[in-house]
Amino acid sequence: GEMCDALKDFPEAIDNTLRIAEMCNLELDFSKRYAPVYKVPGEKIEKDCTFPSAPKPVEEMKDDERYLRQLCEHGLEWRYGTRDVSPEIRARLEKELAVIISKQFCSYFLIVWDFCNYARANGIPVGARGSGVGTMVGYLLGLCNVDPLRYGLLFERFMDPNRSEMPDIDIDICQDGRQKVIDYVRQKYGHVAQIITFGTL
């Protein structure tokens, strides 16, 4: 073929390419999702942090679920001045966490929280927009500054328990610091892809 003609003086290059190709084997299982994992540093888990409305004991929680709950408890104190919040706030938080946990999305929230924290610590303005603003968990993590209960925002617009699609949290990052945040995510989490959406008329 064309490559053989182009590399006729280097037949071993063609042979080696074929040999490498024959050794490659990739099987992708599209029946399940592959979500990123947030590795919770052991020292970050507070042994004495309690979760008054959690449906199961702490010992049965995965690390990412426990850490997300812990951050939400601190978020209640930050946003409302106390963890002893109204039943309405507590019910909304538990409803959201139940869906997030059942869809194995705790790590995703933690990763977004992590790079937003990094951005703020480096003076880079950052914040959520779109349906992700309608989450109590996002509000408690500081991803956005809109109380979804106060403004009647629906969690289901972001993450419907009856639908299988994976949601995403749209985060706006200041242009001046965006590359620094991307570099941080790439350095910390490894496999990072930049996605673009093209609209057509």
Question: What kind of feature is each model-predicted range?
Answer:
Residues L18, W113-C116, G138, E156, ...:
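Short, well-ordered alpha-helical packing segments
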Residues A119, G123-N145, V192-L201:
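Conserved phosphate/anionic-ligand binding catalytic regions in large, soluble enzymes, centered on
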Residues G138-E165:
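Class I SAM-dependent methyltransferase SAM-binding "motif I" and its flanking Rossmann-like core
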